[in-house]
């Protein structure tokens, strides 16, 4: 039995490593820790290889996007999203301005999705889905073009929203994670299937935790 387990771990080491870094990534995301981005870069690099060897091409290209958006998200989170440092500070639960030894809040704050932004992102999702589906059906041998296109397109939108610290991105992740879990189960990627089930559960936790820190603009 131990030999079988050892052999399985050896044969799936790269995927298992990617799954572990992925879980660490989501934990850091829930905690709104900026170090989620470098961890995400490592996880994405691993899954580029995993998805390529499994012929899940749209998800492979998605990981390339994750690498790029991780760099941008890292910058936005550190600089407050505009390159200007926020001047508000938090003390005893109240937002104040000034010095007096108070810690300056420079990181991007959690906000709600604006209606106009939501419309734009919906249009972007539809365009991405159609484009991805046409590419997969005409230029690749992907066996799951519909689900692959859906997951990839929605993930691109969700990751951009995460980089901007928009609260509603968690709703998108809930959908993405459970649809992805079914896809990976059918492809025999069992460590990744377990990972996305965990992702789905953690998305509900993230939804609750981020709600506590939403910036109320007056």
Model-derived features: positions:
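Generic alpha-helical scaffold signal
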Residues: 17, 36-42, 58
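Generic low-polarity alpha-helical segments
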Residues: 34-36, 49, 60-64, 89, ...
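Internal transmembrane alpha-helices of multipass membrane proteins
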Residues: 40-49, 148-154
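Polytopic alpha-helical membrane-helix bundles and their juxtamembrane interface segments
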Residues: 1-32, 36, 80-81, 111-218
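Extended rod-forming repeat segments used as scaffolds/tethers
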Residues: 66, 101-103, 184
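Hydrophobic/aromatic-rich structural module bridging two neighboring secondary-structure elements via a short loop
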Residues: 42-85, 106-107
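Short, basic, low-complexity termini and linkers enriched in Ser/Thr/Gly/Pro
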Residues: 82-112, 214-218
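A generic structural signal for solvent-exposed, polar alpha-helical segments
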Residues: 53, 72, 101, 179, ...
